[in-house]
Amino acid sequence: MFLAGSGPLIRLSIFSFFIGISISLFLGTTIPFIFKRTDLIFKEISSGLILISPPIVLLILGTGDFTDILTPSSVGIIYGILSGLGVCYLVVRSAVIEISNQEFINASKLLGGKNLYIATRHIMPVVVPYAVSYMLASTTYGILAYGFASFYGQVGWTPNWGMMIYDAITYGSYLGGTNYWNLIPPTLGFTLCASSFYFLSLSVKKQFGISI
């Protein structure tokens, strides 16, 4: 059960990370640099998405008819969109605004470079570490949010560690206590899995000197 529960989290992490980083990199690079008026709208949307708690979103969706379709992949897509358009977009946006005033960008404009070419060839490679580091951190929160929702049975019946924790607490009461042999493995699994993404995020920030 422990090994079977690791599969959903791996799929969730992969979908969440790559979807979030794709959205934040492309939109966060092109919109602030090319479409500055549209950027004002996206800035407000992103600020609003930061206030939305992913566990609450999953609980709301799980109370309706969406429980069976809330697979780990679909949860990863939802969380990737929320993270990519939320905090990661704002982080990449602030880095793009700072970089767009540097000398090599002005030199590219003087040489006749198009805005889209400059954004994708000169600015995007510089802001990749920002998107990677913050999406790694956001994936950590996605793992915890999925565990929280799966504990309450709001994300379908896919075998996962949250369900193991629920079973250990619920069915352990019939034996006069908590089944610690069923509770400790998924708890350690959540801790180690979330910590791995968090420490990867810290290492990327330290390697590239990111202080935002």
Feature locations, PLM:
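Membrane-spanning helices that line or support transport/gating and their immediate boundary helices
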Residues: L25-T29, F33, R37-E44, V91, ...
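Short cytoplasmic-facing helical segments at TM-TM junctions of multi-pass membrane proteins
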Residues: V91-I123, V127
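Transmembrane alpha-helix signature in integral membrane proteins
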Residues: M1-F33, C193
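Non-cytoplasmic
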Residues: L59, G76, G84, A131-M164
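Transmembrane alpha-helices
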Residues: I10-R11, F15-I19, I23, L116-A149
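C-terminal transmembrane helix and the adjacent membrane-cytosol boundary/short C-terminal tail
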Residues: G64-L70, Y79-S83, L136, L175-I212
